[in-house]
Amino acid sequence: MRIRDEQDASATFSERYGRPGSDTTRELERLVIGADFGANGYTTLAQADLMARMLRLRKGRRLLDVGSGRGWPGLYLAKASECTVVLTDIPEQGLRTAQQRAAVEGITERSSAVVASARRLPFGAETFDAIVHTDVLC
């Protein structure tokens, strides 16, 4: 059962993730972040690359992206490092958009999406080799 703030977040962000990005926001994202993933967050490309190195992401490793929204930086990290990623968030719309992005990036076989709150993740201990939690409103 979702608590009130999770319901509010789901409603707010489902609407936001359902809107297509404008040309202006995509250009701004390319200039500021260095990538175009749908104006989803503020983690730069350089920061994402640093995370990949620090987490030692590579083929065969499993990454959990908590509060992934439209999939940035989790999908980027999976593509760049060849790891497997599980995206989690409360709003389904963001995860649907992320799954579409995974198809565009050619990584659907190494990515999945689960509607889940960070308060109650449905995974056992030691399921993942690394976890990222970026640009999440807590």
Predicted segments with their positions:
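Class I SAM-dependent methyltransferase SAM/SAH-binding core
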Residues: 62-120
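Conserved alpha-helix/loop element of class I SAM-dependent methyltransferases that forms part
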Residues: 41-59
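N-terminal, positively charged/glycine-rich alpha-helical extensions of SAM-dependent methyltransferases
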Residues: 1-32
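A short SAM/SAH-binding and catalytic strip from SAM-dependent methyltransferases
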Residues: 130-138
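A short acidic, Gly/Pro-enriched loop at the edge of an enzyme's catalytic core
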Residues: 119-130
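Class I SAM-dependent methyltransferase Rossmann-like catalytic core
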Residues: 32-41
